[in-house]
From Swiss-Prot:
Substrate binds at residues 79-80, 122, 160, 164, 167, 195. Keywords: Cell inner membrane, Cell membrane, Hydrolase, Lipid A biosynthesis, Lipid biosynthesis, Lipid metabolism, Manganese, Membrane, Metal-binding. Mn(2+) 1 binds at residues 8, 10, 41, 197. This is UDP-2,3-diacylglucosamine hydrolase. Its main location: membrane.
Length: 240
């Protein structure tokens, strides 16, 4: 058996091929898993669980079908869908997890997270993140009419795209020291995360021993998953 991890699908109505690929994954590979973990940015944007977007409800139904088949599904918020709440979790059958979570998998302790908090050199983003994660700001935003939330979200996405275009690739990647610190805080030798869209397996030293950081790829032209079994940890890219 295996435990599967995915992240950064950025599902949206404008990208039906990615949606179809995700549905195929849920109905195929995922059905034989011990569990599925989605490490953030399942959706390109999320303005509230009350958004009537048919895509959201279709995906909730598809995930619920997986859960009902006996495969539990867990979710860590990303920087695009951090407002996913208990209502969508109930509809989809997913279990919401904290930003940093340690799993015991086949004899390994594995830290999982979205990965945006590791990009500590991007101080502008971290300042923005702190603001939008403030509870009263979220409460105020979710109280606004949907059409206003849509406008705000669109403006924020455009601003983020413009800001990122002028940032160096190094700034938008993880800070190596931040990686070591979080692994040592949780006393783990394995870390799986997404966010950077740079799939790879990195070797490092943490807790005075060899350690491994596995980065999931984004679902653009192909799918990306990490498969953890009793035999090892594998990063896999696959066609939709």
């Amino acid at each position: 058996m295996a435990t599967l991890f995915i992240a950064d699908l950025h599902l949206q109505t404008e990208e039906p091929a990615i949606t179809a690929g995700f549905l195929h994954f849920l109905q195929g590979e995922a059905r034989s898993a011990d569990a599925l973990y989605i490490l953030g940015d399942l959706f390109e944007a999320w303005i509230g669980d009350d958004d009537p977007n048919p895509l959201h409800h279709d995906m909730a139904a598809a995930i619920k079908a997986l859960v009902d088949s006996g495969v539990p599904c867990y979710f860590i918020h990303g920087n695009r869908d951090f407002l996913i709440g208990k209502r969508f979790a109930r509809e989809s059958g997913m279990t919401l997890l904290p930003d940093e979570n340690v799993l015991e998998l086949y004899g390994r302790n594995v830290l999982i997270m979205h990965g945006d908090t590791l990009c500590t050199d991007d101080t502008g983003y971290l300042a923005f993140r702190a603001k939008v994660h403030t509870p009263w700001i979220q409460t105020l935003f979710l109280a606004l009419p949907l059409f206003i939330r849509n406008r705000i979200a669109a403006k924020m996405r455009a601003g983020s795209k413009a800001a990122n275009s002028s940032k160096s690739m190094t700034i938008m990647d993880v800070n190596p020291q931040a990686v070591v610190e979080v692994m040592e805080k949780h006393r783990v030798q394995w870390l799986i995360h997404g966010h950077t869209h740079r799939p790879d397996v990195h070797q490092l030293t943490a807790n005075g021993e060899p350690a491994h950081r596995v980065v999931l790829g984004a679902w653009h032209s192909e799918g990306s998953m990490v498969k953890v079994t009793s035999e090892g940890v594998e990063l896999i890219q696959f066609p939709f």
